């Protein structure tokens, strides 16, 4: 009986694992009414049909159990859980589909490598003619190691956790990104709201777009592009003292772009336009420069 097909782990920059750090207990269920009556109520509701079908076939199966139910089971085994109860960097790491392959994030981008790094773990057991376990031959684990390959990120888990804590408290929808200035390496990447990679369906049902990675999504650059336009203009010999009359709106290609609140700034030069974030000044400046120059 397959316990775990495993998967290569994902690590932070200090080689601390971000996946596969926790486990849950699985009971090896022996076919027969004793197992059915003893453990059925302890089996998660979504797995009971599978549990019952296995019992009906007379086949042993593995089911997650906790607490007293685990104590009642004759044989239990630890199975690694891919994601922590409090997941970390879930938008960056991504999640797995029902097939066990990556659907998004690093899980998807490096799926071949992570799948090749997996270790197949099986529970071997010997059955008698009546479909029960042979007591003198206890079930045991057999592992078929993979390459052991994993993926190391530039992420720092301590910085990531700190950013997630701040984001949960302060941000409804948005993102937090921390970069190492000298190297450009990403140390944290948080997108909010968060989602549970072990229960993606619940996030889809919430309809809060929590599956969107806002840290990597495309946005209109807005006013942060204005200093770049100013620098390009100066490089092209356009004087910073040259003035422009802002009326509060400017039309380009049939679309009207407006300044904040639709009010004009009057006569502005480059310095004043930057200070007051004049949209019209920089739209006309961008048109003068052209895309290739910028």
Spans of features found by a protein language model:
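Short, solvent-exposed alpha-helical surface patches in non-cytosolic proteins
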Residues: 89-91, 185, 227-228
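A short, polar/charged loop-to-alpha-helix boundary motif
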Residues: 27-37, 194-211
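Residue-level structural signal for beta-strand termini and adjacent loop
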Residues: 21-24, 192, 262
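Small/polar-residue-rich segments within soluble enzyme cores
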Residues: 16-148
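Short solvent-exposed loop/turn micro-motifs enriched in small/polar/acidic residues
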Residues: 2-4, 170-171
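Carboxylate/His-rich catalytic cores and anion/metal-binding grooves
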Residues: 109-128, 170-190
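Active-site loop and adjoining helix of the penicillin-binding protein/serine DD-peptidase-beta-lactamase fold
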Residues: 142-182, 198-294
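Short, glycine-anchored, charge-dense loop/turn motifs used at functional sites
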Residues: 3, 7-20, 163, 179-188
